[in-house]
Amino acid sequence: MAKKARIVIIGAGMAGLTAANKLYTSSNNTFELSVVEGGSRIGGRINTSEFSSEKIEMGATWIHGIGGSPVYRIAKETGSLVSDEPWECMDSTIDKAKTFAEGGFEIEPSIVESISGLFTALMELAQGKEISQSDADLSRLAHIYETATRVCSKGSSTSVGSFLKSGFDAYWDSISNGGEEGVKGYGKWSRKSLEEAIFTMFSNTQRTYTSADELSTLDFAAESEYQMFPGEEITIAKGYLSVIHHLASVLPQGVIQLNRKVTKIEWQSNEVKLHFSDGSVVFADHVIVTVSLGVLKAGIETDAELFSPPLPDFKSDAIRRLGYGVVNKLFVEMSQRKFPSLQLVFDREDSEFRFVKIPWWMRRTATITPIHSNSKVLLSWFAGKEALELEKLTDEEIKDAVMTTISCLTGKEVKNDTAKPLTNGSLNDDDEAMKITKVLKSKWGSDPLFRGSYSYVAVGSSGDDLDAMAEPLPKINKKVGQVNGHDQAKVHELQVMFAGEATHRTHYSTTHGAYYSGLREANRLLKHYKCNF
């Protein structure tokens, strides 16, 4: 009997379990397969949990477009899109939100919608889409776009942040004077400062979409390569983990091994040698590495390198150049329901009018929103430095900061179902309706198994780096029959392979990108062994 090829998949997240599922179901028992997971659970950056008796997502949350998404297909086929239990469905949408500027001023929807339209149009232009604006606005937007791109093209590298700034500046140049005059009913806010702050609010939301600490680090050219599925974006009623459990359900008992952290990958000999944190060693013919880009970044920089020999330059350079950020979610439980969705407009950090009681890390969150229309659980998103700071704070510090922020922005305008208002930038002790009873936060940045949330194409990198991430090792030069200068016949192919969202050129940062990457590497091995699939 021929010896089975030994395949070890590192990581039991979306990419790893997709690869394992495909290899097991399509190989006709060709492989000796195992999935080793460093943590105590499967799912990776997918982690469905419960808070206040409601289903929530600590990590991946959205199906980004239902038209053609493999994640949507699985969720639909498994009946995971409907539930009798409350979940983070986000039906209390931002379309219904109240928008408040610092100082207690509720902003007229027409003002917010105008800047929202500008920001959306600029992002659509950056992404190479046809902008969804009326004909009357197209000529003005064309002028703004041309001006913004002309200004940005003067630099060697253009970022999304610099494009957006140039676009906003061009917008202001295109309208009448009076930007520094006050806006009636908005206190010390001028029209320009108010609209600029609203624009910044939308930029902060964009930071959570991309995981970039600053949009000035996000590459402009690569933005148009990123692809999204058509259709609405939805959450999964029975939880994102239902998709993960479906993928894992076909695997025999024992294939998935938890609490098995790989500390060293020795490659370039006849077989790959994996070292584990408990001192054990496993040999494999092929290893599929699905750890996060953050773990790979740490693995090539530390004294105890993850790979031996070190990764070739083309691979390590791509790892260094690509961006990888932190996005965290904060859930707070209110003592009563019927809290409105809020959009938060903050003054500049250097403004003499800002409320100093608002902590710096709260100033770059854009929304506080109930997770569904009848929920007393509110959700805010944080990115970058603010997300990392959130991880360090105690529950009491978070409660105080959130309520101080809500109070300073809403003043006396927001009322709940008991009609008790917030007053004077602080809370009354007897205002039970506005009490936060408990909090829950994600901690993706400080978790050594992830070291962050998801990847982005940073200024100085490109889609080519994402392709380089997907290249298996050793890299074979078939034209000369050599691998890294050695005779190809003496080197085992496909020793170390790579999957995960950071290895997909057009769907990076998404669960479906991770799914496609796992499928890609499984198919690469199936083709190598001439399996019918």
UniProtKB/Swiss-Prot annotation:
Tissue: Expressed in root vasculature, leaves and stems.
Cofactor note: Binds 1 FAD per subunit.
InterPro entries: Amino_oxidase, FAD/NAD-bd_sf, Flavin_monoamine_oxidase
Record field: pH dependence: Optimum pH is 6.5 with thermospermine as substrate. Optimum pH is 7.5 with spermine as substrate.
Top-level class of the enzyme under EC nomenclature: oxidoreductase
Keywords, ordered alphabetically: Cytoplasm, FAD, Flavoprotein, Oxidoreductase, Stress response
EC numbers for this chain: 1.5.3.-
Cytoplasm in keyword set: yes
Thermal properties of activity per the entry: Optimum temperature is 40-45 degrees Celsius with thermospermine as substrate. Optimum temperature is 35-45 degrees Celsius with spermine as substrate.
Observed phenotype of the null mutant: No visible phenotype of seedlings under normal growth conditions. The double mutants pao1 and pao5 exhibit enhanced tolerance to salt and drought stress. Increased length and thickness of floral stems. Increased length of roots. Delayed transition from vegetative to reproductive stage. Increased levels of thermospermine.
Pathway(s): Amine and polyamine degradation; spermine degradation
Subcellular locations according to the entry: Cytoplasm
GO CC, one annotated term: cytoplasm
One of the GO BP terms on file: regulation of timing of transition from vegetative to reproductive phase
Role description: Flavoenzyme involved in polyamine back-conversion. Catalyzes the oxidation of the secondary amino group of polyamines, such as spermine and its acetyl derivatives. Substrate preference is spermine > N(1)-acetylspermine > thermospermine > norspermine. Plays an important role in the regulation of polyamine intracellular concentration. Involved in xylem differentiation by controlling thermospermine homeostasis, and participating in the tightly controlled interplay between auxin and cytokinin that is necessary for proper xylem differentiation.
Official protein name in the record: Probable polyamine oxidase 5
